[in-house]
Amino acid sequence: MKSNKVTFFLGLFLVSAFCVRLTENMCFKDDDCINQGEWCPVLRVCSYAECICPWGTRSKLPSCQIICAHLDKKSVNSYNPCGCNYK
């Protein structure tokens, strides 16, 4: 019976540690992505609660949307010339 309690609390501890780790890695704004993950030559972007590196082929976002997001504006189109409007 004692071993069942120890196993239960060990399992509970591991589950709670896993949940804390998942929520710590989430981002809500671009500032949460500073100094996270692998090296990236440009500022990381928070996209769908995950930090991504918008560089080259690593990102599926068009460069125009990334530029507008850094300016805190909304992208008008994804093509050149890039147009941004206020949100």
Swiss-Prot record:
Q: Which residues cross the membrane?
A: none
Q: Name one GO biological process term.
A: killing of cells of another organism
Work out whether the entry's keyword set contains Secreted.
Answer: yes
Q: Where is the signal peptide?
A: 1-19
Cysteine pairs forming cystine bridges in this chain are 27-46, 33-51, 40-53
Keywords of this entry:
Antimicrobial, Disulfide bond, Fungicide, Plant defense, Secreted, Signal
Which is one Gene Ontology cellular component term of this protein?
extracellular region
Q: Which domain of life is it from?
A: Eukaryota
Task: Assign the protein's first listed, main location to one coarse class.
Answer: secreted
Q: Where in the cell is it found?
A: Secreted
Q: Which family does it belong to?
A: Belongs to the DEFL family.
Instruction: Tell me what this protein is called.
Output: Putative defensin-like protein 304
